[in-house]
Amino acid sequence: MTEARIIDGKAFAADLRGRIGAAVEHLRTAYALVPGLAVVLVGENPASQLYVKNKGEQTREAGMHSVTHRLPVDTTQEQLLRLIGQLNADPSIHGILVQLPLPPQIDPAAVLAAIDPDKDVDGFHVVNAGRLAVGLPGLVPCTPLGCLMLLKDVVGDLRGLNAVVVGRSNIVGKPMANLLLQANATVTVAHSHTVDLPEVCRGADILIAAVGRPEMIRGSWIKEGAIVIDVGINRVPARDPAAAAAGKTRVVGDVAFEEAKGIAGAITPVPGGVGPMTIACLLLNTLTAACRSKGITPPDDLMP
């Protein structure tokens, strides 16, 4: 049997960012509108600093207005909420993203609830979650949106396909299931209490792994020819024992990739699969929010 097609999320995301950049230039020339994204970072978490740096660079490369607010680790919740209120009222800012995790003195739920739903480019606000659940226009969480784009690029029409989403988080699992339902797939959401999870997975034409457990989904769980989207990003010890003993790590997904690629029809690698799509879809949401703020229809050719 031939090996699975490797779904190149990095290349797809680069193409999407290029098309977003062209749409931004059109907004600038036709409407004098420049989409603006504000990212808020509290503290000095190294991973968060890298994420914020990458987001800022890609926002500027797309021709958007980019603002980063770096706050000290001892920032109070009241101070952060005050900043969010200012960003909500700023007409040059169309998207607001607060980088998680936050320090323990700050309640992330209260912070996310304070963001104007029309500027909630992460798509985490309960208003946007509700809009997605009932099929109304809103801002969709970036990672599930990116997964849907990759799926439609590989499969085309998802109508009638059996999709299994392993994981039920508010960030990936639940919104992913809603997007698949809207695409007319038949959807099962599996989780830690699912009985005979391997058998459930084997029934999937489309398998989305979003559990945060390294290589939990084995090759024997996958139906021959299935499309596998691996959302997991997990750090595990390096393969080389000496490197592992020195604290070196490697990144793996939630799927045992080497096993799965001999069975699946197509699969996303980790890294280089879903990850690059997340920031690209953040830019897409910022563009969408900017268009809606002025009553402009977002470009249809950018949406899945």
Curated annotation (Swiss-Prot):
Signal peptide: none
Catalytic activity: (6R)-5,10-methylene-5,6,7,8-tetrahydrofolate + NADP(+) = (6R)-5,10-methenyltetrahydrofolate + NADPH; (6R)-5,10-methenyltetrahydrofolate + H2O = (6R)-10-formyltetrahydrofolate + H(+)
Taxonomic superkingdom: Bacteria
Gene3D superfamilies: Leucine Dehydrogenase, chain A, domain 1 (3.40.50.10860), NAD(P)-binding Rossmann-like Domain (3.40.50.720)
Pathway note: One-carbon metabolism; tetrahydrofolate interconversion
InterPro entries the record matches: Aminoacid_DH-like_N_sf, NAD(P)-bd_dom_sf, THF_DH/CycHdrlase, THF_DH/CycHdrlase_cat_dom, THF_DH/CycHdrlase_CS, THF_DH/CycHdrlase_NAD-bd_dom
Keywords on record: Amino-acid biosynthesis, Histidine biosynthesis, Hydrolase, Methionine biosynthesis, Multifunctional enzyme, NADP, One-carbon metabolism, Oxidoreductase, Purine biosynthesis
UniProt xrefs under NCBIfam families: PRK14186.1, PRK14188.1
Annotated family: Belongs to the tetrahydrofolate dehydrogenase/cyclohydrolase family.
The protein's name in its UniProt record: Bifunctional protein FolD
Lineage, broadest ranks: Bacteria, Pseudomonadati, Pseudomonadota, Alphaproteobacteria, Rhodospirillales
Gene name, Swiss-Prot/TrEMBL: folD
